[in-house]
Amino acid sequence: MIQSSPFPQPFSSPLAQPFGITPIQQPKPQQPREETMPRFVNYLADYSGCGHWRILWPEQVINMTQRGLSQSITAMIAEPRWYQGVKAVKLQRQASKAQLEFVKHLKKIQQEHDFKIIYEVDDVVFREEIPDYNKFKFAFDTDEVRESVVSIMDLCDEVTLTCDFMRKLFQSKLTNQKVTVIPNFVPYNWMGYLFNQKRVQTAFEKHKSKPRILYTGSGAHYDVANKTGGKDDMSAVNHIIRKTADKYKWVFVGAYPPPLQDLVKSGKLEFYPWRSLLEYPQFIANLDPQLMVAPLTQNNFNNSKSDIKFIEACTLGIPCLCQDMHTYSDAPDDLKFNTPEEFEEKIEWILNWKNRKRYFQNIRMLREIGVKRFLENPENIGSHMEALTTPYGSPERKYLKQWNP
């Protein structure tokens, strides 16, 4: 019998292995990496520019770099089990009474699953601060919406928005003082890859006899319904545009000032309807502008805006002449104006062919400003991650400190 054999049992020691090889130990099953990644849920208010800048683009980078699992939806889910394992729930610009009731329900679920609730907003939602010329004011112009939006924000653990002026304005309106700035960051794979220094220089030379000046913006910037007697974000400089229509080729994308309709019809001003978010960057680059402009009326609503126009221009290496206000506080002084007269003078100074050497030198400087605001930069996507995964005021927030000193 084998048991009584004087020889060792087969494979009872490493010395008796076939060919001297130890049997391979089967590894224990490993959890998929996704099982250990934080999960985030976003309730969107829109799938347009605001939704992409503030949630959908950051979500894409978070998912593609496996920093977490982020999911955006519009239908609000009341089932508590769905929130198991969720680290944060983000609410984008929710303002209705029904949405307030849902947030109250969400607070009850929060007690069981211990997730964070964040209110995300990129525009002022208080009706008393929205200019009458803004054609979208009606969406927030009732007592019910005003009360609901404040109540929702006060129920949240934190509010995130785009700039410091906006932060202070919201803190003056809310009981909830936990308000955090996360600027808008431009995705490299959306616009950043389009930079071409040689093209910018060649376009400047090509159009030196009649430089091209670009303004992009929706009808919300214009008094299209004549509610303010024509006073809007462009009214202060409309006469400069008319005056210089033969000297420069003014180009408008999205909408144009109603008082300048005759120049559009005659072809002196170029106008192009709004393009989809996917088409927009390439379309703007193909227009070959030598200068972009960003006039704004001084009010709390506009001071709370993000500097998107400036950052987009920098990303392409093109100068953008901005209104001298909080919105564009990071722009170089040479690219800011206060009065219509200064607007005209600085346009001449920037686009004068005699100053081409300085214009060419500034292309790279502007591009470097844009590069610092790429969404994919660790410190920028890191700001989004810190807001999602750490409590307000946490010492772990090293990236957010830059925007929230």
Range-by-range predicted roles:
Residues 46-61, 184-286:
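Conserved catalytic-core segment of nucleotide-activated headgroup transferases in glycan assembly
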Residues 89-90, 118, 154-164, 251, ...:
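A short beta-strand/loop micro-motif in the catalytic core of glycosyltransferases
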